[in-house]
Amino acid sequence: MARDRVPDVPDPSPGATDGPGDAPGDRPMAHTDRAMNVAQKLIAAHLVEGEMTPGSEIGLRVDQTLTQDATGTMVMLELEAMGLERVRTELSVQYVDHNLLQTDEKNPDDHLFLASAAQRFGLWFSKAGNGVSHPVHQARFGRPGATLIGSDSHTCAAGALGMLAIGVGGLEVAMAMAGQPLYITVPEIWGVELSGTLPDWVSAKDVVLEMLRRHGVSGGAGRIIEYHGEGLAQLTAMDRHVIANMGAELGATATVFPADDAVRQYLGAVGRADAFEALEADEGAGYDLTEQIDLSSLEPLIARPSSPGNVVPVADAAGEEVSQVVVGSSANPGLRDFAVVAEILQGRQIHPQVSLDVNPTSREVLAYLITGGWLGMLVASGARIHQSGCMGCIGMGQAPATGRNSLRTMPRNFPGRSGTEEDSV
C-alpha cells in the first residue's frame, strides 16, 4: 500500500486540553562559531551550569514539563510540600491517560485530585479520554528548540519536532516546575544517517526496530540519538514520533530530529504554524558515533517475545497463530496507522478466535476515524473499540489469554507487561 494513501495528521478540535493559554512561540537560540549538530544546539541554548564536555554534569533550563496520572500524583504532592504557588516553567501539562479503568473509586478520586492540583499550580489539564500524552503534547504544545522533561519514559517522543525531550523521575519534574535546572551527564551524540526510500509496507517502526535489531535495548544508554540525512524526506512528523518514542526502548537519553519542512507542515496542519522555528545541524557538524541505515534495504520487522530487542523479519514469524491483535499506542499514534488496518479489513470479518482491540490514541484521531468512515469499517469487521489512552500498553485491561500469542503495535513486550504473567507478546 502506498504510504501517502491516507493522512497521518488530523487537525485538532477544540477542547482537547483545558489550561491557561496557548504555548509561547519562537524563542531565540544560542549561537556559536563552532559547527554544531541539532542535539548540541539544543543543549547549548539551555545550558545554565557546567560545560558541554562528554561525561561532565550540566544543568539545563527546562521549558516544558509533562506528567501523567500514574506518576503525577506524587509530583503534585511534592509541589504542595515545597509550598510552590505557581509553576515557573513556560508550560506544564498534567495528562490522564494511564489509570483509566474505574472498577472502584480510587482512579476517579485521583483524577479529581489531579484536576484540582493543575488548577491550583497553573498547569494545563488533559482529562481522561483526551488521549495518550505524547502525541497530544506534540500536537498541542511541542515546538522546535524547546526542552521538555516528563515523568514518563516515552517523553522522548517529542524529539520528533526538534525538541530535547527526556523522561525523568517525578522529583526531577517537580524541581523543574519550581524553576530549577535539570542536571544530567553530558551524553554522547550518536548520528544516524538515513538514506534511500522506504519500500511499500515498510514503515517508520521498522527503522527503529532495525536499530533495536542491531544494538538491543541498552545500545543507546548514555547517548542522544540524532537522525539526519536525505532519507528524512521520507518521514513525516508522525513517522518521526514513532522513532523518537522508541528511543526509550534503546535506552537512549533522548532522540532528536531536525526541525525541517516536515515539521513545518505538521505544525501548520495542527493549527500552530507560528510555533515553527527551523533547527538543523550546521554544515560540517560531527558526531561522537555514527551509523548508517539505507531505508531501501529495510523489510518489515517484528519483535518476538519477550523483548523489544528480539527483532526478526516478519517473514520469520509468518504462520504463527495469534488470538489477540491490539492496535494503538504512543508508538503508532497517527491516523494512518488505524486507517490502514480499517482498509485491510473492509468487507472482511475478523476470525472468530481472534480479538482485535483498537485504542484510538486521541479524541481527534477517533473523530477522524468516524468522519473518514474507518471506524465503521473496523466495527463492521468485529473489532473492539476502546477509549483513547494507554490501555493495554501498560496492562490497563486487554490482557491476553494464557498460552496464546498477542500481536501488538506497542513499544514494549517485556514479560508480564500485558497484564498476563506468562504472556507471549
Language-model region placement:
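Fe-S-dependent hydro-lyases/dehydratases of central metabolism
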Residues: 1-425
